[in-house]
Amino acid sequence: MKKTLALIFLSLIILKAEEFKVSNTDEIKSVMKKVQPGDRVILANGEWKDAAIVFDADGTKEKPITLCAEISGKVILNGNSSLKIAGDYLIVDGLNFLGGYIEKGAVIEFRNGTKKESNHSRLTNTVIENYNHPDKTVDYKWVSLYGTHNRVDHCYFRNKAYQGCLLVVWLSDKPNYHLIDSNYFAYRPDLGNNGGEIIRVGTSDWSMYPSYTVVEKNYFEQCSGEREIISNKSVYNTYRYNTFVECQGALTLRHGNNCDVYGNYFFGNNVKGTGGVRIIGEGHKVYNNYFQDLEGEDAFSALSIMNGVPNSPLNRYFQVKNAVVAFNTFVNNRHSIEIGIGKNDELSLPPINCTIANNIVYSTKGKLVKNVDEPQNFKWEGNVFFGSELGIANPGGIEIKDPQMKKIHDLFIPQNSAIVQNKAAGNYDFIVEDIDGQKRDQLKTVGCDEMGVAKRIHLPMNKKNTGPFWLKHD
């Protein structure tokens, strides 16, 4: 009996997770040789200058390995510091990259070289701020996601002021299934050229491969590096429940097909060049979104649908086909809907076989719809437009009636229930809730918000409900 108890006790000692406190990269390297599932590697508080950290280990689903700050936010990485995360079931928590820069690659990379990528791993509660090269033409990323099933959440990314996308999902021959959520992206100045995206999912070369990445519940404030705030370049991705404030650009479905964009808020606050969603490609669905006070036009319109290039190569513009734009609300935008943008001798294919249904469009600023090129075989139904001139000959499916928009808690809500409540046309079974997460049944309300008193599940994101838990914003 005593022998059995001794063996059990010994097993518990062996299985008990350990904590390793480290003060430099040599100590981290040494710990990586003996770290086991469930262990924690704790970085000592203070300045870590020119620290090239390699977190190369393998945890398990039940027992991930964690690399964390002694106190969240108190480990300051600067100079030429960087981090590579390589292995399965790893967590990085509470780091603060502040005021340094690197020469190439990425500040945080979910791989170690090209041989070992990271899977089922997480970057959380971390800051990268002002990590800018003195030469603004030098291109490196802040976060590069490789592998599969990784998550970046509750991080703060501020003031990337040089060339290169901030966060990139890199594709391979198998889907990624990454999750990017609850982050605060802030203050990206206009670069004056391409390469200033906040998030890019894929590349032109891989744009017809599936990624299944989800970007949700993030807050984007004054992210204006270029015309594409988010650049989709792959297939089967979802962009939902994000909030964009004073961003001079658009969530752009640049390459790839069959993506969903729903439950997002776009607030322009009447700032020049602020935009919403731009559609390129096939099979996209844009629904349950709210667009307010956006001042952009053309590719920066609240909703723009592009022309395409015949026999387009992967890096140009594929014709828009079979898109659905439904149950959105547009309020006080300078250019609410523009169709066929970019039309010229090369971009000669107008959008075809698309549906515009059950949207509320209200504005007194400019024409509600602009056809730069004439769309082909569009289906319009159940829409309520009011305010300015329609801008096109009514194709049917647009009622010119006042929805009586009233501002309630920073959002404009229709008060004329007689023309919107239970008045949606058509059968859109894939839409089962509204922008708030309230249930939609067969008798749906026009616009993004279902009339009723049910609890609101999804609210606009802001600087207080995104980003690191330890970082307080006024």
Predicted region positions:
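Sec-dependent N-terminal signal peptides
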Residues: T4-I13
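Right-handed parallel beta-helix/beta-solenoid
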Residues: K16-S30, P37, N45-E47, I71, ...
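Beta-solenoid repeat scaffold
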Residues: F20, P37-N45, K49-I76, L83-G94, ...
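Extracellular beta-strand repeat scaffolds in secreted/surface proteins
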Residues: D39-L43, N383-S388, T445-C448
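Glycine- and acidic/polar-rich repeat regions and solenoidal domains
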Residues: A52-I53, G79-A86, L98-T124, I128-H409
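Short, compositionally biased
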Residues: V54-I65, R111-G113, A454-K464
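Surface beta-loop-beta hairpin patches that serve as ligand-binding interfaces in beta-rich domains
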Residues: N394, D402, H409-L411, Q415-D474
